[in-house]
């Protein structure tokens, strides 16, 4: 504790001489007072009882809650627009080359921080810079690998659904018709209806609205490629379709990246970003196809639990048996159509919730008894 703060503390109450004589005359001995330590008294330079880091409560708390943390880095996507052109590509390739002969077990010592006579850079500084490049390279590879795995899982889940193939077929059919006849009012109405399903992505929505124009050509190519893989190639396995879609995304990304830079050499970070853009748009097309594929023109049947259907009477059972023996009915008759002529009666709980009078239910039961007779 600081000496000035120690003098400002109130002193403990001292025993007077008369009180000491009275205590000695009575034969009572004064018990020695143990110094009590108030740990909650003061902080900083006014703290008591913390003469070493091992006894300091805040130091111990910080040590117990300390967690090793390495900040996340991605050379391709962090600090967009703040670095020199092609610098990300150089750092990525440098980290990949340094990773091969990098000594991860090296322990820096005092003499390692002395600058070199020729280069003026200490070996410790060079080692730390190399470690930063290697760490950034490894974290970038890990994040890009996770992004690719996530894309593969999403694509595999979507193309496994039959609704996606049906919706993509109708979407491609509409796009081909609209490109050849953009002035058609019915097709324009369909276009605005389709755009309603893609309001969360402005880039995709604008490209869909301008798909008949040159600025929407890339989306038309993407839909054609996905349709040729998912709809046309029905014999391909699920893994082959995922691989074909990935190859198509890489081909499209490389083509447009070279078109942007007007050179066969494109920085790897820009090529990865363009590939990621096409991957996100491919997922958007497949998701839109899933939304459109659920709107079928098939007859929708509501499956009713067997416990909520009235059991067959003897007369109805014999009638159904006669129809089955004679082969009555059409060949397209489905399982649910077999019981279409039966009468379904809701449960008593459902009737009570709907507020139907008990007299109505009794009347229905009488009608059923007459039907059975």
From Swiss-Prot:
One GO CC term, this protein: host cell nucleus
Record has Nucleotidyltransferase as a keyword: no
Subcellular location: Host nucleus
Post-translational events: Cleaved at different sites by the viral protease during virion maturation.
UniProt keyword annotation of GTP-binding present: no
Protein origin, superkingdom: Viruses
Chain segments carrying region Interaction with packaging protein 1: 1-150
Biological process per Gene Ontology, one example term: viral release from host cell
Annotated stretches, region: Disordered: 1-32
Induction: Expressed in the early phase and late phase of the viral replicative cycle.
Record-listed Phosphoserine modification sites: 52, 334
Keywords: Host nucleus, Late protein, Phosphoprotein, Viral genome packaging, Viral release from host cell
Family, per entry: Belongs to the adenoviridae packaging protein 3 family.
Subunit architecture: Part of the genome packaging complex composed of packaging proteins 1, 2 and 3; this complex specifically binds to the packaging sequence on the left end of viral genomic DNA and performs packaging of the viral genome. Interacts with hexon-linking protein IIIa; this interaction is required to promote correct genome packaging.
Miscellaneous note of the record: All late proteins expressed from the major late promoter are produced by alternative splicing and alternative polyadenylation of the same gene giving rise to non-overlapping ORFs. A leader sequence is present in the N-terminus of all these mRNAs and is recognized by the viral shutoff protein to provide expression although conventional translation via ribosome scanning from the cap has been shut off in the host cell.
Record's function text: Involved in viral genome packaging through its interaction with packaging proteins 1 and 2. After proteolytic cleavage by adenovirus protease, L1 52/55k protein is removed from the capsid during viral maturation.
Protein name: Packaging protein 3
Record organism: Human adenovirus A serotype 12 (HAdV-12)
Lineage of origin: Viruses, Varidnaviria, Bamfordvirae, Preplasmiviricota, Tectiliviricetes
């Amino acid at each position: 504790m600081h000496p000035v703060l120690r003098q400002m503390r109130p002193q403990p109450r001292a025993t007077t001489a008369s009180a000491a004589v009275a205590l000695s005359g009575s034969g009572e001995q004064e018990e020695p007072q143990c110094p009590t330590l108030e740990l909650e008294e003061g902080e900083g330079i006014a703290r008591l009882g913390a003469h070493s880091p091992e006894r300091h409560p805040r130091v111990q708390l910080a040590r117990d809650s300390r967690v090793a943390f390495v900040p996340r880095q991605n050379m391709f996507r962090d600090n967009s627009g703040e670095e020199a052109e092609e610098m990300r590509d150089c750092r990525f390739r440098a980290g990949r080359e340094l990773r091969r002969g990098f000594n991860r077990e090296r322990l820096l010592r005092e003499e390692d921080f002395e600058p070199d006579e020729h280069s003026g850079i200490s070996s410790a500084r060079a080692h730390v810079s190399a470690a930063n490049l290697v760490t950034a390279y490894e974290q970038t590879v890990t994040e890009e690998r996770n992004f690719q795995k996530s894309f593969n899982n999403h694509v595999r889940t979507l193309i496994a659904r039959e609704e996606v193939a049906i919706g993509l077929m109708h979407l491609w059919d509409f796009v081909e018709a609209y490109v050849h006849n953009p002035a058609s009012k019915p097709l324009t109405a369909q276009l605005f209806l389709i755009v309603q399903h893609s309001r969360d992505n402005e880039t995709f929505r604008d490209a869909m609205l301008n798909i008949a124009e040159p600025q929407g050509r890339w989306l038309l190519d993407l839909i054609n490629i996905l349709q040729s893989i998912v709809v046309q190639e029905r014999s391909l396995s699920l893994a082959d379709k995922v691989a074909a879609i990935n190859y198509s995304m890489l081909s499209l990304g490389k083509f447009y990246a070279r078109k942007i830079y007007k050179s066969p050499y494109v920085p790897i970070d820009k090529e990865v970003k363009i590939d990621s853009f096409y991957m996100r748009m491919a997922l958007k097309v497949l998701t839109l196809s899933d939304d459109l594929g659920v709107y079928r023109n098939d007859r929708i049947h509501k499956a009713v639990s067997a416990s909520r259907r009235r059991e067959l009477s003897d007369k109805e059972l014999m009638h159904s048996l006669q129809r089955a023996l004679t082969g009555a009915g059409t060949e397209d008759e489905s399982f649910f159509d077999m019981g279409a002529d039966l009468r379904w009666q809701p449960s008593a709980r459902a009737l009570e919730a709907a507020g139907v009078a008990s007299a109505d239910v009794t009347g229905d039961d009488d009608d059923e008894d007459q039907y059975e007779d």
